[in-house]
Amino acid sequence: AICTQDSYLFSIAFLACAAANKHIILPGNYQPCALAELSEQFDCLLVDDSIGEVEVSDVRNIQTLLDTETREPRTDNLPPVDLAEIHLTLFTSGSSGTPKAINKTLEHLDIETAQLDKNWGDLLKGNRVHSTVSHQHIYGLLFRILWPLCSGVPFARSNLEYPEQILSHANKNCVLISSPALLKRLKNEINTAQLAGVFSSGGPLPTESAHQSRNLLGHLPIEVFGSTETGGIAFRQQESAQTPWQLFDCIEASLNSENCIKLLSPYIDNNNWYQTADECEMVSENQFILKGRTDRVIKIEEKRVSLVEVEKRLEQLPWISECVVIPFEEPERLILASVLVLSEEGQAKFATMSKGKFWLMLRSELRKWLEPIAIPRKYRIVDEIPLNSQGKRLTSHIEQLIKS
């Protein structure tokens, strides 16, 4: 297994493991206890100085290995590896809360890297890559490590973690690999900087944040829609919330009876269709509008409620910039609860009325669209939705906000 925050040391370890025909394990979490919990998945853990002490039988520091290596470096070419035989395991959030292992081969990643270069090779050429996302996950692995390596493009070994760092490093030769988690935090910045290009993936990017990124960084972000299981599916630059997604040209798609998209993709399996839980509307053979996840449907008092629809109805109100809706167990019943980020108009409205009247106003508006059972009964107002560095919602943090 490889777990580092240093992308240079990660690249050395990754290529060495591939050359040695090893099965590569990429934990998605840097925390020592989480790494120890995955120890049955690997024989040896390769780390850098950023990783704390881990209770694993064989832990090796990559920099120490490099510093103490006494053999002469090889100058001849290494023998080619069979990419289809080099296996890789990544981890994604499982519905049970336990990390879910996703298996791929380097051949899958090689095909996807070639597709990225086909689409945007000219954007990368002659520039350098900065990133705000981890290489331990598939988006960062592809966009900040493998694609630059295969294209001979330099990349930063450390993450940019704050909006001001993005702006201080930004120039016309910088391509930024980012996520909604950080791009949304640019809203309070006033300085501008011209980048060569911006990519975003890992979660939905609000239209307001996409336009703010264009104002500050010179480009609408290229959003990439996909998952650990599927790899990239489609991309867009969001002029409006209804801007359709464009399939990568090596992928075929169709809808099942529930209007969920299924894929025939070389990133997964060339011969078998892969069914997703993403509800879509096909607007052409290779473009679609994303409606939401059908697996975010719950039952409350025997009625099916789509959490995605409730969020959509809240966010179409002029007072709400962004929200998340979750089921919440009260002693006697299951209800919906929502964490809200107010728009400027919403903040002004909230300041002129009591909290109770504001909630009543929201509920009154939602009744135009939703059954009473689907209207959230608890609300919390925050400055931003809790997200991890990949742009995924931090459910435990959201639950704590509701309980507080």
Residue ranges and their predicted role:
Residues 72-91, 122-129:
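Conserved pre-ATP/AMP-binding loop-to-beta segment of ANL
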Residues 41-50, 103-119, 124-185, 222:
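AMP-binding/adenylate-forming
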Residues 187-241:
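Gly/Ser/Thr-rich phosphate-binding loop
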Residues 252-275, 279-281, 287:
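AMP-binding/adenylate-forming core of the ANL superfamily
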Residues 1-30, 127-135, 304:
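Conserved AMP-binding/adenylate-forming
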